[in-house]
Design a protein with these regions (language model features):
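Eukaryote-skewed repeat-based solenoidal scaffolds used as protein-protein interaction platforms
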Residues: 133, 140-224
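Alpha/beta catalytic barrel-like cores
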Residues: 1-138, 146-148, 198-202, 207-211, ...
Length: 237
């Protein structure tokens, strides 16, 4: 069994949660603030990223951070290209901790339009994916947001997610598809029904390929059970 096959098996059957270690430039100051460092602790962006990397390294090297509790970790691109205890970060996570490495690939959300926020364009995606594969990344993560029960907008969100997911699959990586439904959505249950229909249409056309779905807890019990049981869905997280 290859390392990738071992990771596939763990992602399908293992226990634990996926740790988010993917703060980008916009969210890093808040993350460091919660950690106890205010903006006086750095003079420029480079120093800020050095500090947040040290914070992440402290987290992942802690004895409690292991594959017994954690399925995977989502990394920012800088973290993917960095090291933990002198070892490439992705190799450290898997070989030392048995934690599956993922890469955050989206560049944030576009402005809200018709009750949804699509992802901003991802320039150089092909190169990013090639670099991720070279660094032994297992999969990717990308997020959109649905704020209203607008069927057309929800279809657009799902269309964009799966269009990019196909490119990710072609590169040999497993995408986490995340069309988040805002918990404050006035017609959340209705929006989730539209979302279920849109996703089912797409996963039915994946052939033998598999994706991971990251979905908001639905209003209706077991609404997404058909997706969790779908042969083309590795896991719902």
């Amino acid at each position: 069994m290859t390392e990738f096959e071992k990771q596939l098996d763990k992602m399908a059957h293992g226990n634990g949660f996926i740790a988010a270690l993917d703060q980008s430039g916009g969210s890093t100051p808040k993350a460091l603030g919660n950690y106890g460092l205010d903006e006086s602790a750095w003079n420029n962006e480079e120093e800020m990223f050095d500090l947040v990397h040290k914070m992440r390294e402290r987290i992942v090297t802690n004895p409690s951070f292991t594959g017994n509790r954690i399925l995977g970790a989502i990394l920012f691109e800088n973290t993917m290209n960095g090291t933990f205890e002198g070892k490439p970060s992705t190799d450290y996570l898997w070989s030392k901790k048995e934690v599956i490495p993922f890469l955050k690939i989206d560049k944030g959300l576009a402005d809200e339009k018709n009750g949804a926020q699509l992802m901003k364009p991802i320039p150089g995606l092909e190169q990013i994916l090639a670099g991720a594969k070279k660094q032994n990344i297992f999969g990717t993560k990308m997020r959109s947001v649905i704020k209203e029960a607008n069927e057309s907008s929800i279809n657009s969100v799902v269309e964009q997610q799966f269009q990019i997911a196909e490119q990710i699959l072609e590169s040999g990586l497993i995408p986490i598809v995340e069309p988040e439904v805002d918990i404050n959505c006035a017609e959340k249950s209705k929006a989730e029904s539209f979302l279920l229909n849109a996703i089912e249409t797409k996963v039915n056309n994946l052939g033998s390929k598999q994706i991971i779905l990251k979905l908001t807890l639905p209003e209706k019990d077991n609404l997404f059970l058909p997706l969790a049981n779908h042969k083309n869905v590795l896991r719902v997280v």
